[in-house]
UniProtKB/Swiss-Prot annotation:
Temperature dependence: Thermostable between pH 4.0-9.5. Average melting temperature (Tm) across all pH values is 60 degrees Celsius. Lower melting temperature in acidic pH 4.0-5.0.
Gene name tied to this protein: pvalb2
Keywords: Acetylation, Allergen, Calcium, Metal-binding, Muscle protein, Repeat
Origin species: Gadus morhua
Alphabetized SMART domains for the sequence: EFh
Example of a GO cellular component annotation carried by this entry: cytoplasm
Name of the protein in its database record: Parvalbumin beta 2
Amino acid sequence: MAFAGILNDADITAALAACKAEGSFDHKAFFTKVGLAAKSPADIKKVFEIIDQDKSDFVEEDELKLFLQNFSAGARALSDAETKVFLKAGDSDGDGKIGVDEFGAMIKA
């Protein structure tokens, strides 16, 4: 599992179950349930690097859409509306993508 040693499998399962229905994803609730909100900056950076599929040092909209699938291959894709809300929450400089510092700030917000 990609998050072994960083996040607990049971927490991931519970967090994914809570946002199974389309339109139910709430990034703040997800970060808390999965245990990410309590993690160190180093662990948050490791998670960011996993989510940054193309290794561009940014998480773009297409990567956010598939965010949940980083936690479980069978998880659903986020809806366009959920993806846009998620991007807006994390993109503090308005460049259309989320950098590692923005990601960390969004998790701790």
